[in-house]
Amino acid sequence: MNAFRLTVEVNGVTHATDVEPRRLLADFLRDDLHLRGTRVGCEHGVCGSCTVLLDGQPVRSCTVLAVQANNSRIETVESLQKDGQLHPLQRSFSKCHALQCGFCTSGFLMTLKPLYDDEDVTLDATSAREAISGNICRCTGYQQIVEATVDAFHCRDHND
């Protein structure tokens, strides 16, 4: 099979490498770039654990071919922490005990990040539930995840 020359920016770093045309974006990120924060749960795009941002939009990396990301910008959960400081969403997830095993957490965080970055978006408990409705957690139920989401947006909106 012929390799495809992939050029992609991942977490601010440009990578140019050959990939098999059938290689999934999740596998490229985890195995080729060693970014293991992106988790693969269902391998069908249903659970949301593999969510990353592709040109600022959440996508299920287990259903996207790496070649589809050519000349694009990708953000993974590893991009959230800056200079040793957790992103406000990560702080709220920790503060509100919104994780147990942590397998799904990166997917929730990357689903919420574009909403958090849009200062025109505010979330209450109802809209937070809707925002995360495409992500599945098998451990916590969802109350703590909703509380963490509302807390992060409240802190952002009130400069806490």
From Swiss-Prot:
First and last residue of the signal peptide: none
Co-factor requirement: [2Fe-2S] cluster
As recorded in UniProt, its EC number(s) are 1.5.99.14
Q: Is Iron a UniProt keyword of this protein?
A: yes
Q: Name one GO biological process term.
A: nicotine catabolic process
Binding, [2Fe-2S] cluster 2: 101, 104, 137, 139
Report the residue ranges that make up the 2Fe-2S ferredoxin-type domain in this protein: 4-80
Task: Give UniProt keywords alphabetically.
Answer: 2Fe-2S, Iron, Iron-sulfur, Metal-binding, Oxidoreductase, Plasmid
The cross-references to InterPro entries, in alphabetical order and at most eight, read: 2Fe-2S-bd (IPR002888), 2Fe-2S-bd_dom_sf (IPR036884), 2Fe-2S_ferredoxin-like_sf (IPR036010), 2Fe-2S_ferredoxin-type (IPR001041), 2Fe2S_fd_BS (IPR006058), Beta-grasp_dom_sf (IPR012675), Diverse_Oxidoreductases (IPR051452)
Q: Which CDD domains match?
A: fer2 (cd00207)
Cofactor binding mode and count: Binds 2 [2Fe-2S] clusters.
Q: Which reaction does it catalyse?
A: 6-hydroxypseudooxynicotine + A + H2O = 2,6-dihydroxypseudooxynicotine + AH2
Residues bound to [2Fe-2S] cluster 1 are 42, 47, 50, 62
Any one GO molecular-function label of the UniProt entry: metal ion binding
Task: Look up the domain of life of the source.
Answer: Bacteria
Instruction: Report the pathway entry.
Output: Alkaloid degradation; nicotine degradation
Q: Which PROSITE patterns match?
A: 2FE2S_FER_1, 2FE2S_FER_2
Known function: Molybdo-flavoprotein enzyme complex involved in nicotine degradation. The subunit gamma (large subunit) contains the substrate-binding sites, the subunit alpha (medium subunit) binds FAD and the subunit beta (small subunit) has a 2Fe-2S ferredoxin-type domain which binds 2 2Fe-2S clusters.
Q: How does it assemble?
A: Heterohexamer of 2 alpha (kdhA), 2 beta (kdhB) and 2 gamma (kdhC) subunit. Dimer of heterotrimers.
What is this protein's record name? 6-hydroxypseudooxynicotine dehydrogenase complex subunit beta
Question: Species lineage, top-down?
Answer: Bacteria, Bacillati, Actinomycetota, Actinomycetes, Micrococcales
